[in-house]
């Protein structure tokens, strides 16, 4: 089965993972316990990045962005903030937002580091990642569609 080609699950609390491929194209999936949250690809212009001598590109930079918790600049973080973090904010936490002692990005990053895991698969051809992404988003690989970005 294709799902067995993916890495094991790694916790974002341990990001960055040792020995993670520094320059690589691929597909990744993000989990909250047993719920598939998000599927995406990274590394579209891998050849160009390699020719330019980039030392970090593709999967590592995308997952690093997700680990940051910055909702304004990262689609996954925006989905997570809007669908999971904001609905769980308590009245006590709201007062901390008002006085500036807590930000949405801080809460999103905290949630990611405490609860979220990722898996990835490095590919030689980016088109393979795109093809697999469609299958994952339709529920064909993991038996469920991602909560945040499914395809019909």
Feature names for model-found ranges:
Residues 1-57, 61-97, 121-152:
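GIY-YIG nuclease catalytic motif and its immediate N-terminal context
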Residues 97-119:
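Alpha-helix-centered segments that form part of catalytic cores
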